[in-house]
């Protein structure tokens, strides 16, 4: 119950005191803000999309699991490619697929070459100490600094076909051979 109460406060911009009464249309406006909250309201359109996606969850989840498993199976042969999240995909549904490239290569150049071949990649995630809100000295995080220069996120979405996966893996490996 404490968690529910706290979540209700956070969803309403951190407003406390009589928050629940305001949602019951009793219009009590005696309130205070003691903590940071966010606007977690959802539009009807977002709710409709969410309901439709939930109906397809099993289908979409199994596609993501199968794609991640194919990537795992393909990349396990290569010592210079380390999968960041090898998992039991029966229990988890990955939302991203990250690789660490343990080979001297300019990751940003690699990404631009992949994009040139119509393979969009990402970098998940930028170290927190790079962000203004969490700014700190990177010398305290030497391993993070090394890994963040080698990490790349490959496409992982239910629309990928077997041919797409082959193209992604073969193109990546060909670029790494150069």
Which residues make up each language-model segment?
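PLP-dependent aminotransferase class I/II
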Residues: 2-178
